[in-house]
Amino acid sequence: MTAPANVRVRFCPSPTGTPHVGMVRTALFNWAYARHTGGTFVFRIEDTDAARDSEESYLALLDALRWLGLDWDEGPEVGGPYGPYRQSQRGEIYRDVVAKLVEAGEAYYAFSTPEEVEARHIAAGRNPKLGYDNFDRHLTDSQRAAFLAEGRQPVVRLRMPDEDLGWDDLVRGSTVFAAGSVPDFALTRANGDPLYTLVNPCDDALMKITHVLRGEDLLPSTPRQLALYQALIRIGVAERIPQFAHLPTVLGEGTKKLSKRDPQSNLFAHRDRGFIPEGLLNYLALLGWAIADDRDVFSLDEMVAAFDVVDVNSNPARFDQKKADALNAEHIRMLTAADFAARLRHYLDVHGHRLALDDAAFATAAELVQTRIVVLGDAWDLLKFLNDDEYAIDPKAAAKELGPDGAAVLDAALPALDAVTDWAAPQIEAALKTALIDGLGLKPRKAFGPIRVGATGTTISPPLFESLQLLGRDRSLRRLRAARERAGQHSA
């Protein structure tokens, strides 16, 4: 598909709650399409619901996009030619558009209460829950004046066309809603405040949005929006109707939509575990799109080069935490050693984990765990033995490795290590192999298990000889001597 010369897409969340991975997937697809086409990515805040919106959630949205590296060309804190980009600051714009729609006969004042609408349906033998019946379309001036004299406050409703409303969805193909299936709908509350049904298409029109990429859950609102776009074009507010692409639902367990109550829906929970942006974005891209049939791992740049919204699959996509974890591990392994060390240092600092290592030693420690972790949070359990206040021998590990055989190993290992003058991994390895494998005739697992438990407190650690080097000579020998005493207790 060839996109128009000036693609303009938007991401327009409401600032409620914590950023959701389904919402972030929508942001990613919009961002990638803008970057692929050389277009513009607009970030707009839909904060017209004062009861639910919060400044904390607004700041969380900024934090989320910045952490992921999804930069916006227009929007909050960046500006642009069609601002302001927070709907709470655009009230006058909406009131002006509503006045023009009413003046042109595209919209009208409706005074009916929900109870009156239900009563009319019942009187006509219809289902009382059918919704609005378009009754106020036909009010006379005197009827309207009488309602106003009663003190009634009207809403403003759009006059829906008496024809089918359809569009060629870029993901789902031809989609049609039959004439009469959507009643005239409210654009404002009775107090005059604009509703989402007005502000969303109104802003898209004024901000010259060309493509609307959004979740499938919003598909039923599309015929209303098409009718509003047509009216906005007729009154000179809109230039065009954008193209629509409804992205597949993200599922959680079973066939249920991933909801805010599902822990894996929380973007920041993944960040706290130690996902890196590259890994999470790669996985989210796969929720409805693929770069190739035989390839799951790719960079953001590679996604941008390949992404076209018409290639998005319409089938629901299930969020699979294990697959997300595996992709994150791949991206961690793809980082340069220096980049990984910097990210790990920052992650540990943020989470209050301090390793008393200088930069060179930390770089060595980071390199030891880079291929052994799935998320950054896994590194702490592997490295915390380097802190004396975190070091403790696990009882199960002691029972396994610090028995009579372990005592014999440590009796041979301690003098061999004591004689090492240049405390570095190759020399440590040579001394232990000579003493334990050559001297005692042990296999490596039997030889090194007691050393690992004595030095790190556990049976699972980074490579042993490098771990001893990082611990340093004095601490290594001190821990191993204490382990030998403990092994003596086990062997008694």
From Swiss-Prot:
NCBIfam families: gltX_bact
The gene coding this protein: gltX
Known function: Catalyzes the attachment of glutamate to tRNA(Glu) in a two-step reaction: glutamate is first activated by ATP to form Glu-AMP and then transferred to the acceptor end of tRNA(Glu).
Any coiled-coil regions, as ranges: none
Binding site for ATP: K260
Localization per record: Cytoplasm
Listed PANTHER family: GLUTAMATE--TRNA LIGASE, GLUTAMATE--TRNA LIGASE, MITOCHONDRIAL-RELATED
Family: Belongs to the class-I aminoacyl-tRNA synthetase family. Glutamate--tRNA ligase type 1 subfamily.
InterPro entries named in the record: aa-tRNA-synth_I_cd-bd, aa-tRNA-synth_I_codon-bd_sub2, aa_tRNA-synth_I_cd-bd_sf, Glu-tRNA-ligase_bac/mito, Glu-tRNA-synth_I_codon-bd_sub1, Glu/Gln-tRNA-synth, Glu/Gln-tRNA-synth_Ib_cat-dom, Glu_tRNA_lig_a-bdl
Motif ('KMSKS' region): 257-261
GO CC field: cytosol
Enzyme class: ligase
UniProt GO MF annotations: ATP binding; glutamate-tRNA ligase activity; tRNA binding; zinc ion binding
GO biological process, one term: glutamyl-tRNA aminoacylation
Repressor is among the record's keywords: no
Subunit-structure text: Monomer.
Keywords: Aminoacyl-tRNA synthetase, ATP-binding, Cytoplasm, Ligase, Nucleotide-binding, Protein biosynthesis
Keyword Ligase in record: yes
Protein name, UniProt field: Glutamate--tRNA ligase
Catalysed reaction, written as an equation: tRNA(Glu) + L-glutamate + ATP = L-glutamyl-tRNA(Glu) + AMP + diphosphate
E.C. code: 6.1.1.17
Matches recorded under Pfam families: Anticodon_2, tRNA-synt_1c
Gene3D superfamilies xref list: 1.10.10.350, Glutamate-tRNA synthetase, class I, anticodon-binding domain 1, Glutamyl-trna Synthetase, Domain 2, Glutamyl-tRNA Synthetase, Domain 3, HUPs
Renumbered ranges of motif 'HIGH' region: 13-23
